[in-house]
Amino acid sequence: MEPIDNFHYRIRGDQILRVDSLIPSFTDLKPGSELFHIVTVEMEPEPAVFCRKAAQKSAAQSGLLDQTDEQREGLIYLSCLPWLDFTGVLNNREGPDDGTPQVIWGKYRRELDGRLTLPYSIDANHRLMDGLHLGKFAENLQKLLEGVEENPSH
């Protein structure tokens, strides 16, 4: 998402602004709990560093969300449904000026031909991005996933 300008656009009043960086805000479950909470953490160049910081923030956070994080520009809402192989998901929107992209991915599965598939849904404000931009995201995601080992050794 980061290299695609349209994911950075937000509507404020009668203007369209571009935020400098995107900030993941995602749902997480604490061990032994069925009550999720929303964790917001700045992106890091190294995935391992991001994961460590996200785990630390999640463990330290006691409420549903950190209200100071919700006021930040550049949020991207992320969620996961690892139990479902879906064909579509609808997200809640705060109105026509809500420009925060929302991404949900589900349960991956192996096709008969051996390929792994991963369902995902992107809910974006059509005034800020179009199919061209979602197509660029899909291409970038495909390249990223092609570089992931299925069963990496540690």
Where are the language model's segments positioned?
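Short linear motifs at secondary-structure transitions and domain/linker junctions
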Residues: 1-4, 11-15, 51-56, 76-82, ...
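Small-residue-rich loop/turn and linker elements
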Residues: 3-39, 71-74
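Residues in well-ordered beta-strands of folded domains
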Residues: 10, 25-29, 39-40, 77-81, ...
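Glycine-rich, charged/polar anion/phosphate-binding loops
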Residues: 11, 62-63, 86-90
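Helical lid/core segments from catalytic subdomains that handle acyl or acyl-like groups
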Residues: 28-84
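Short amphipathic C-terminal alpha-helix that caps PH/PH-like domains
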Residues: 51-58, 137-145
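Intrinsically disordered, low-complexity linker/assembly segments
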Residues: 83, 89-123, 127-129, 134-142
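Flexible helix-coil linker/hinge segments at domain or subdomain boundaries
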Residues: 143-154
